[in-house]
Amino acid sequence: MPQLDTSTWLTTILSMFLALFIIFQLKISKHNFYHNPELTTKVLKQNTPWETKWTKIYLPLLLPL
């Protein structure tokens, strides 16, 4: 049975990684990213029913003497 020739595998694998890196860099460079996303996104706070009502829990150990 002939022996498998693996002398070109390193070159093939390295060139594959280089090609994948270049392809992904080109794909990522075409995306538009916001410079400061904190200024563009506004979080609207919605009050839940238990936040609108006045509620307070008194623990016995926190009561003044």
Curated annotation (Swiss-Prot):
Keywords on record: Acetylation, ATP synthesis, CF(0), Hydrogen ion transport, Ion transport, Membrane, Mitochondrion, Transmembrane, Transmembrane helix, Transport
Parts of the chain that traverse the membrane: 8-24
Keyword Membrane: yes
Modified residues (N6-succinyllysine): 53
Coiled-coil ranges from the UniProt annotation: none
UniProt signal peptide: none
Entry GO MF terms: proton transmembrane transporter activity
Assigned GO CC terms: mitochondrial membrane; proton-transporting ATP synthase complex
Pfam families named in the record: ATP-synt_8
Entry's localization field: Mitochondrion membrane
UniProt record, GO biological process: proton motive force-driven ATP synthesis
Membrane topology, as annotated: Single-pass membrane protein
N6-acetyllysine found at: 53, 56
Subunit structure: Component of the ATP synthase complex composed at least of ATP5F1A/subunit alpha, ATP5F1B/subunit beta, ATP5MC1/subunit c (homooctomer), MT-ATP6/subunit a, MT-ATP8/subunit 8, ATP5ME/subunit e, ATP5MF/subunit f, ATP5MG/subunit g, ATP5MK/subunit k, ATP5MJ/subunit j, ATP5F1C/subunit gamma, ATP5F1D/subunit delta, ATP5F1E/subunit epsilon, ATP5PF/subunit F6, ATP5PB/subunit b, ATP5PD/subunit d, ATP5PO/subunit OSCP.
Record's function text: Subunit 8, of the mitochondrial membrane ATP synthase complex (F(1)F(0) ATP synthase or Complex V) that produces ATP from ADP in the presence of a proton gradient across the membrane which is generated by electron transport complexes of the respiratory chain. ATP synthase complex consist of a soluble F(1) head domain - the catalytic core - and a membrane F(1) domain - the membrane proton channel. These two domains are linked by a central stalk rotating inside the F(1) region and a stationary peripheral stalk.
Family: Belongs to the ATPase protein 8 family.
Protein name: ATP synthase F(0) complex subunit 8
